[in-house]
Amino acid sequence: LWKT
């Protein structure tokens, strides 16, 4: 999971 990416937090961008």
Curated annotation (Swiss-Prot):
It comes from the Eukaryota. Expressed by the venom gland. Its main location: secreted. Keywords: Calcium channel impairing toxin, Ion channel impairing toxin, Secreted, Toxin. It is found in: Secreted. One of its GO terms (molecular function) is calcium channel regulator activity. GO terms for cellular component: extracellular region. The keyword DNA damage does not apply. Specific inhibitor of store-operated non-voltage-gated calcium channels. This is Tetrapandin-2. The lineage of its organism: Eukaryota, Metazoa, Ecdysozoa, Arthropoda, Chelicerata.
